[in-house]
A protein has these predicted regions:
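Binding-site signature for planar aromatic cofactors or substrates
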Residues: 1-222
Length: 222
């Protein structure tokens, strides 16, 4: 992924929290010479995500993508969020120089790794249990795998395949107006906060506000 230095994010805790908040990843793989994408929710069973850690998910057995896991094939996993259009009209400097153009702000994490397929029934049950507990943790009345009839769960497990991704490379890009002067950033924050019905805009405003000062040596490149 192309990442100018001022957009590079290396804080593993921040990256891990972002993936926890946006677990639906786009997994891209080479299948018989063609690039194939699948959207799957991935989570880390324990702690922060880093090189050497593992992410787990599952897919329908009818989806042939799991078969690349039997070959221990390399895949690319993409997580993204808070995509927000930034208008030049947000910048106070527009009225002074008019040397401004539109752009998009976003957060993105790219993970390269080796995929493995998991067919053992107990292992699949554990994957489903972990994913369910993490997804349901914020609910007032969380659902648990044990709430469903045992024979029903067994049927469901028979029709899925677990997948595990070993993280071998991870890159994170936080494009949150680091390349704009402080007053332009404030203009963007004010503009985004006006979009009260758009969660992406409000979250992006928080990300920009968290920047503080500009990173040394920032450039105006995208």
């Amino acid at each position: 992924m192309y990442i100018p230095s001022h957009f590079l994010e290396t804080d593993l805790q921040k990256i891990s929290q972002f993936i926890k908040t946006h677990p639906l990843g786009l997994m891209v793989a080479n299948v018989d010479g063609e690039l194939v994408g699948n959207h799957l929710p991935f989570m880390a069973p324990n702690g922060n995500i880093a090189v050497g850690s593992k992410l787990i998910s599952h897919t329908a057995k009818a989806n042939p993508i799991w078969k690349i896991g039997e070959k221990k094939q390399k895949v690319l996993l993409v997580f993204s969020g808070y995509e927000t259009y930034i208008s030049p009209s947000s910048y106070p400097t527009k009225s002074e120089t008019h040397k401004v153009v539109p752009t998009y702000n976003y957060l993105s994490v790219h993970i390269n790794g080796t995929l493995s397929a998991i067919q053992d029934e107990e292992d699949k049950h554990q994957i489903v249990k972990i994913l369910t507990e993490k997804m349901e943790s914020s609910r007032k009345d969380p659902w648990a795998v044990a709430d469903a009839p045992k024979d029903y769960i067994e049927t469901m497990l028979a029709n899925i395949v677990g997948v595990e991704l070993l993280v071998e490379k991870m890159e994170a890009k936080w494009k949150v107006s680091q390349n704009r002067p402080a007053r332009d950033r404030q203009g963007v924050i004010d503009d985004l906060r006006g979009n009260v019905n758009d969660p992406n805009s409000l979250e992006m405003a928080r990300e920009i506000e968290a920047l503080g000062g500009l990173k040394p040596g920032h450039q105006e490149s995208e």
